[in-house]
Amino acid sequence: ANLDDPHSLHRLKGLAGTVIHLAPPPSDGTIDRRTRHLAAILPRHGTVVYVSTTGVYGDCGGASFDETRPVAPANARAVRRVDAERVLRRWARRAQARLAILRVPGIYAGDRLPLERLKQGTPALRPEDDVYTNHIHADDLAAIVARAIFHGAPQRVYHTVDDSDMMMGEYFDAVA
């Protein structure tokens, strides 16, 4: 099946009561056509876990915040993620279904580290340009997805971050 081709999805309709939606939005436009195509085949009374991004909040200026902060996407990709969240919320209401939205920061794992950037000597951030950042290990994210499937409260947004309060420069130092 191909989320860019809605006809290819019809054969999947009704096959799964639980769906984990990890696909990124398309690279252009202001709507997430892929999520719209997926929502059209999702089952009534189903469960969906959508892996979104903390990027939907835009630039928070280093402030700490929780899931109640209004979204303020600052780039087209984040706008498409907000669109996907709204599409899935509408589906969940209409289908009397369970939806967990996981807002995820940078994902890291052994094969997902900025090693090439470090090997190439790409300059890191100057202290005056540094920003706070959060990350999550891929294994921790997988465990949270499983927990959201079985124990997540319906129609909830969850921040899935490591809560490290680390500057981006410190992150690069730790990786190095």
State where each predicted segment sits.
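Rossmann-fold cofactor-recognition segment
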Residues: 1-6
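NAD(P)-cofactor binding segment of oxidoreductase domains
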Residues: 12-51, 83-87
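Conserved Rossmann-fold NAD(P)-dependent oxidoreductase catalytic core, especially the SDR/UDP-sugar
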Residues: 37-76
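Short-chain dehydrogenase/reductase
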Residues: 63-86, 131-135, 165
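Conserved beta-loop-beta element that borders a ligand/cofactor-binding pocket
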Residues: 86-110
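Substrate-positioning beta->alpha
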Residues: 107-117, 126-149
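Mid/C-terminal beta-alpha module of Rossmann-like enzyme folds, strongest
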Residues: 142-176
